[in-house]
């Protein structure tokens, strides 16, 4: 396998796996339970500050989200898009390492950049070996997240399957059950209907019943959770992570059903429940 210590020492060859072996329980629980596993992405050299600055320089600007979170108590989760025209990758990295609340999402970096694509392909191969499944995941979008020490991700639910590969820095992650107390149907319907992005109402009292509360991540962890599980993240230091997002037939089926329920609720005044619906009702939607 060929990895790149980008712009530092050129191309180096190394025969290495990127993930530790999974136990039989971990293989059986993939996609069913919250799990924290180990990986070695940092050892590729592709996620150093120097390598990431080079990636930012060559990645299409329209696929880079540079956001600042202002200190506004009335809108604590507000994100302001920053015009980074004229800024090079090193400047953006330095901004993320400043005292501000900075969030940089390098969208589809793992898919589009040849150096990172090679790593993504190997991850797919290793995940297939560990789980026996890969067809849907092969269509994933792989983005790289670069965020400041004060940045956080508010309580939300993803309509896609999500794999969080934490690579550098210290962050805390909370993952919650999927029941109505944590994720009411109406709140999730708002997500698939496009009424909101992915954020949901949150009360810190929910932390007492979180499945993971919290997981301290220091780099080298892969965090997995069942589709639609609410979660949130708080940085402690400057952080670098990679996120895989993809849909499966099951997640697409659920989203379509929740979309239909949202329409029935909003346009016809009905009160459908996805969790209590029979299999026949779910298929009919």
Predicted regions and their residues:
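N-terminal auxiliary "cap/dimerization" subdomain that precedes the catalytic jelly-roll/cupin core
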Residues: 2-103
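Hydrophobic alpha-helical hairpins/lids featuring a short glycine-rich hinge
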Residues: 99-121
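Conserved double-stranded beta-helix
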Residues: 112, 121-162, 213-217, 248-285
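A short secondary-structure junction signal
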Residues: 116-119, 153-158, 174-179, 183-188, ...
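Short, conserved beta-strand element in jelly-roll/cupin
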Residues: 145-148, 158, 162-172, 177, ...
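Double-stranded beta-helix
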Residues: 168-224, 229-230
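A short hydrophobic beta-strand segment most commonly corresponding to one strand
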Residues: 237-253
